């Protein structure tokens, strides 16, 4: 292996130790695939729980990126379980529907962007499934999402779903016509890069104005010079280790304040 390759590997391993992304799952973490049905069709979520924290653990509902539920969301769920948050990664596409490229990701996410009622129904069904998992306190819930999932958790907020908090990582912020945040019941945290072309700062300002108008309890952390998908380890140059670590700490603080 070339020296450059060794240096890159060392950097990745160091980052993994800081974030926990490269660690073997601890023995006390229970993890399982969970198949559930919506309108007679199967969906496959993923559940992680740390047995060391006992029963009635606060719940995190994790919504996947536009390429569907994969190893990224599973690792994030494990990381949250290690901190004492039972985590259910919801499936919005259906069992076996896992986009393999950009075109397929656009197609699957586009179906739900175009049909918000279906998006809401699948989110609500995933939430209900998560709340009845063993060891979970279904009355203490925060929903988080990445990219497409970041937009989806804001859909949950506008729908008035009974959740204590909503966290959007590098999501998109367009509010469909006829919707607003007047029914939002929980706190909102936005974690975003200032150079995100998917949701530029004008969109951030618009979102803040909409939530202000609805008297929503919200906070925003903006990471200067940071691109879209900054927490995604496989996103190449868009990945930003510092912003990833900052946003992870912000999430843990939010969870501690909201559902601990």
Question: Model-found features: residue ranges?
Answer:
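Serine-hydrolase catalytic machinery in alpha/beta-hydrolase-like enzymes
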Residues: 33-133, 230-235
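Short alpha-helix in the alpha/beta-hydrolase fold that links the catalytic acid
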Residues: 76, 200-210
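A conserved short beta-strand
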Residues: 162-172
